[in-house]
């Protein structure tokens, strides 16, 4: 996408950014109740932000009059006409899901050294529990050596406005976006990569439930709890897997009758419920996943039915590998059409609420299903079974 030392279509990208930004601010306020503080920072700059909704690139852009190139999943750019349109309008920097980030980092470096602005969400994926996730320290090294300014930016309220497990469901409340700090190139050169990383971690840290307890905000919408099974798959009362079912604002275990409601504030309400929020429930569930992995013998740890597996063919989409059931064992992951030794899996991540991307060396797989599944459990399990796997939620 590069030509003559810059980016092909550069003038078009700037025009589209400036022309659509005022409209984007209006639409984001109508849909989310989103407000933002306009930044007057001059480029080139590396912009880093926490990641909470699918709308984050548009939300972040509302604060910056200067155009920036976003790092985005290669999968989005392969998504039919919409992906081609996004590529033509703004030419994002592609990032392979569950693959190595080295090529992406080099492209970002070239852009920054040519005086262009780059925006990246270093977590790589949206939060599941409302807490900013860990990320690779390579972003700090890039910031220090690029010669550009570093801008840290935080979005708040997005976790409840658009929960990842809820798919495209949007609940209107209050969202806000603002620059946290601007670090000059001189400041960055005076710091070590570790110090820069610590600053980024501190600036981007957000705990949605902690903020919500202090200043409760209602996020109104329909069917508030539907598809929560994409996140929760263990009943805390009977301990059975895949027995929780959601409908409207209620989740119920069809085995033991345990039930709770998801409130407009994002908290949970129910008789004898052990957790009043999804952050604590998710932490408990991760511990249970580790226990299940450690206690498993030669039987499957998890089984999910009715899945479709494709291999990712770079530049031309995907190719069907098989349909059927997937099973995770301590030593392998069995997919329709392939059996992957756990030690050969080098990367695992999720796109959206439940599309599972798996890398085994240079081969990339994507697991999809028209049925609601909790696929995030595989990330926790595989990262425990294989400590060398690149893990992204």
Enumerate the language-model features and the residues they cover.
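Long, charge-rich boundary regions
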Residues: 261-338
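Phosphoinositide-dependent membrane-docking surfaces
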Residues: 47, 325-356
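Soluble catalytic domains of membrane acyltransferases
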Residues: 3, 7-17, 21, 26-198, ...
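Short, flexible loop/turn segments with low-complexity composition
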Residues: 210-221, 391-393
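Cys/His-rich short segments
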Residues: 220-273
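Broad, structure-driven detector of short, well-ordered beta-strand segments within folded domains
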Residues: 153-155, 243-245, 260, 324-330, ...
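Short amphipathic C-terminal alpha-helix that caps PH/PH-like domains
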Residues: 192-208, 375-388
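Acidic, Ser/Thr- and proline-rich intrinsically disordered linker/docking segments
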Residues: 343-393
């Amino acid at each position: 996408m590069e030509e003559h030392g810059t980016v092909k279509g550069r003038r078009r990208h700037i025009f589209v950014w400036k022309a659509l930004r005022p409209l984007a601010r209006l639409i984001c306020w109508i849909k989310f109740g989103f407000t933002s503080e306009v930044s007057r920072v001059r480029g080139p700059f590396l912009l880093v932000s926490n990641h909470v909704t699918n709308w984050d690139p548009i939300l972040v852009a509302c604060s910056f009059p200067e155009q920036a190139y976003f790092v985005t999943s290669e999968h989005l750019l392969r998504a039919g006409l919409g992906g081609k349109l996004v590529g033509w309008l703004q030419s994002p920097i592609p990032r392979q899901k569950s693959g190595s980030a080295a090529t992406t980092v080099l492209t970002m470096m070239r852009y920054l050294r040519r005086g262009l602005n780059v925006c990246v969400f270093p977590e790589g994926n949206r939060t599941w529990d409302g807490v900013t996730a860990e990320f690779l320290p390579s972003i700090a090294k890039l910031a220090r050596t690029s010669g550009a300014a570093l801008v840290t930016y935080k979005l708040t309220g997005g976790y409840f406005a658009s929960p990842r497990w809820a798919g495209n469901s949007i609940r209107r409340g209050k969202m806000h976006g603002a620059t946290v700090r601007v670090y000059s190139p001189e400041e960055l050169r005076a710091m070590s990569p570790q110090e820069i990383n610590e600053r980024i971690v501190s600036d981007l840290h957000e705990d949605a439930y902690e903020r919500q307890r202090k200043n409760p905000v209602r996020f109104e919408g329909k069917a508030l709890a539907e598809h929560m099974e994409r996140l929760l798959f263990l009943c805390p009362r009977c301990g059975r897997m895949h027995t929780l079912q959601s409908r409207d604002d209620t989740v119920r275990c069809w085995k033991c009758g345990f039930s709770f409601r998801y409130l407009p504030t994002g908290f949970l309400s129910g008789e004898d419920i052990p957790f009043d929020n999804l952050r604590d429930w998710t932490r408990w569930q991760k511990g249970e996943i580790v226990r299940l992995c450690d206690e498993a013998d030669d039987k499957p740890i998890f089984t999910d039915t009715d899945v479709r597996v494709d291999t990712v063919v770079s530049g031309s989409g995907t190719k069907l590998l098989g349909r059927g059931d997937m099973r995770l064992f301590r030593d392998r992951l069995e997919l329709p059409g392939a059996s992957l030794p756990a030690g050969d899996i080098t990367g695992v991540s999720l796109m959206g609420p439940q599309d599972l991307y798996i890398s085994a060396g240079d081969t990339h797989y994507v697991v999809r299903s028209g049925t609601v599944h909790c696929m995030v459990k595989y990330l926790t399990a595989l990262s425990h079974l294989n400590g060398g796997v690149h893990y992204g939620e």
